[in-house]
Swiss-Prot record:
The lineage of its organism: Eukaryota, Metazoa, Chordata, Craniata, Vertebrata. This is Hydroxylysine kinase. It is an enzyme of class 2 (transferase). It comes from Homo sapiens. The gene is HYKK. One of its GO terms (molecular function) is hydroxylysine kinase activity. One of its GO terms (biological process) is lysine catabolic process. Catalyzes the GTP-dependent phosphorylation of 5-hydroxy-L-lysine. It is found in: Cytoplasm.
């Protein structure tokens, strides 16, 4: 498929439901009386914050998720995601509750006549989780440690998850799976010809030479794959000393889940925690310490971490530039990572792998002695 045709098909896939249509969907599919809806930002799906009329014992706030046409063609994957959300909630993780349709399913396929064709979209309803995205707050080393720990616990817990359609998480050409970094090559035109593109091309080259050859040595698991600073919610409480303490109150967006490796999860988490940090290079050590308190990395995994973090920066930055060409009206949301991401990636390259690793690994080691840096 040519890039032109590919762009067009991708552009058509994002849902464009109005607030009135979203409200009608909730009432017809889930049987709830809607009092108000408001759109929420989303990368390539459509989300709405839904308020319903007070019921005797049910929640009054939900998130309506409308999958794009491409994702809607894979109902098995959506079903597995829903069951993972329910499984993690039962295991004590702060995930949403999945609402059942009037037909007692966890999702429903709705068809819409767009005039030129009929499009089908999978719709789901999840309970709305309280809290603020950590992107809105300065994150302490202790919270970074807890987020690293959470990422490892999540992956480890999912080793116990079973489902007859689990194979749907083997997403071979999924652009957001970290092992598919070489697939970025067909989107590089979105960057133009500049220094940023040169860095990305260099990262892809190193990835092919130094990561692809080591994949068989990494330990496999199911990855959340998108523990970014907008998908982790936190709430504050007062400590005994009167200071504010923050706890994770919500984990959002399981749409990028796939089979991967433990080291992928920690690399992705480190990269996203760097985005808003005033000391981005320091972040990795605290996240790594938390992760390794549950799942210590092997020497081979540790050796790949620097390049994997760089690779995730490249995935996010390239796909944001590409998506901005498709959805210019969504530019503010799509370019959140780019505001600081290019600068952080450049800094990592300027410092070099050895210097960055030294900071990360020394910081992580300091937790073992009880004196965190």
């Amino acid at each position: 498929m040519s890039s032109g045709n590919y762009q067009q098909s991708e552009a058509l896939s994002k849902p464009t439901f109005s607030e009135e249509q979203a409200s009608a969907l909730v009432e017809s599919v889930f049987g709830l009386k809607v009092s108000k809806v408001r759109p929420l930002p989303s990368y390539d799906d459509q989300n709405f914050h839904v308020y319903v009329s007070k019921t005797k014992d049910g929640p009054t706030e939900y998130v309506l998720k409308i999958s794009n046409t491409k994702a809607s063609k894979n109902p098995d994957l959506i079903e597995v995601q829903n069951h993972i959300i329910m499984f993690l909630k039962a295991a004590g993780f702060p995930t949403a509750s999945v609402c059942h349709t009037k037909g007692d399913n966890t999702a429903s396929l709705v068809s819409v006549d767009s005039g030129s064709e009929i499009k089908s979209y999978l719709v789901r309803l999840l309970t709305y989780l309280p809290g603020r995205p950590i992107a809105e707050l300065p994150v302490s080393p202790q919270l970074l440690y807890e987020i690293g720990k959470l990422a490892a616990k999540l992956d480890k817990t999912l080793q116990r998850f079973h489902h007859p359609k689990l194979s749907s998480l083997h997403r071979e050409n999924f652009i957001w799976n970290l092992k598919n970094v070489p697939l970025l090559e067909k989107y590089l035109y979105a960057l133009g010809q500049n220094r940023n593109r040169e860095i990305v091309e260099h990262v892809i080259h190193l990835f092919k030479e130094e990561v692809m050859t080591k994949l068989s040595h990494f330990r496999e698991c199911i990855n959340h794959g998108d523990l970014n600073d907008h998908n982790i919610l936190i709430e504050s409480s007062k400590s005994a000393s009167g200071n504010a303490e923050y706890q994770v109150s919500g984990i959002l967006d399981f749409g990028d889940m796939s089979y991967g490796y433990y080291v992928f999860e920690v690399a992705i988490t480190i990269m996203y925690m760097m985005i808003e940090s005033k000391s981005p290079i320091q972040v990795g050590g605290h996240v790594l310490a938390g992760f390794e308190s549950i799942t210590p990395l092997t020497a081979v995994e540790k050796g790949a971490l620097f390049l994997l973090v760089c690779s995730r920066f490249c995935q996010s930055l390239v796909m944001a530039a590409y998506s901005c060409q498709l959805y210019p009206e969504n530019k503010d949301y799509l370019m959140v990572t780019a505001k600081t991401g290019w600068k952080h990636l450049q800094q990592m390259f300027d410092m070099g792998q050895k210097a960055v690793e030294e900071i990360w690994f020394e910081t992580a080691k300091s937790y073992e002695s009880g004196i965190s840096m």
